[in-house]
């Protein structure tokens, strides 16, 4: 199923030097977001930087949201993760997409112009309405949390 999402190009290199975000395979859940900067960036250990992607989106449909997730190889191999862990883009947001990158590693890391640094994934949204209760119906788990079910 394909859902149209409005995308605005903010940097003229998108679509010429660098491709629009796209799914790499028919089974891909996310589209790669790239560092669309004027120069390479060096992220020092412990440093967090905000990196432009060169695009803005407007999801518009309140039953959808977009999330920005890390690329697994950057985190595992180089210690580069999202500074906010997950970026949430509400359906009514219309601004530029930025990626917060945090170098949790011990070495400086260089991001070149156009490097793929995160993934954009669209997810369904359900808006809840709270129903106030005095007690919950008993469940098997109850209030057990934070390791309650064990590791084995």
From Swiss-Prot:
Pathway: Pyrimidine metabolism; dUMP biosynthesis; dUMP from dCTP (dUTP route): step 2/2
Domain of life per record: Bacteria
Cofactor: Mg(2+)
Gene3D superfamilies to which the protein is assigned, alphabetical: 2.70.40.10
Swiss-Prot/TrEMBL keywords: Hydrolase, Magnesium, Metal-binding, Nucleotide metabolism
Gene: dut
Protein family membership: Belongs to the dUTPase family.
Protein name, as recorded: Deoxyuridine 5'-triphosphate nucleotidohydrolase
PANTHER family cross-referenced by the UniProt entry: DEOXYURIDINE 5'-TRIPHOSPHATE NUCLEOTIDOHYDROLASE (PTHR11241:SF0)
An annotated Gene Ontology molecular function: magnesium ion binding
CDD domains recorded: trimeric_dUTPase
Gene Ontology annotations of biological process type: dUMP biosynthetic process; dUTP catabolic process
Binding of substrate, residues: 71-73, 84, 88-90, 98
Keyword flag Metal-binding: yes
Catalytic activity: dUTP + H2O = dUMP + diphosphate + H(+)
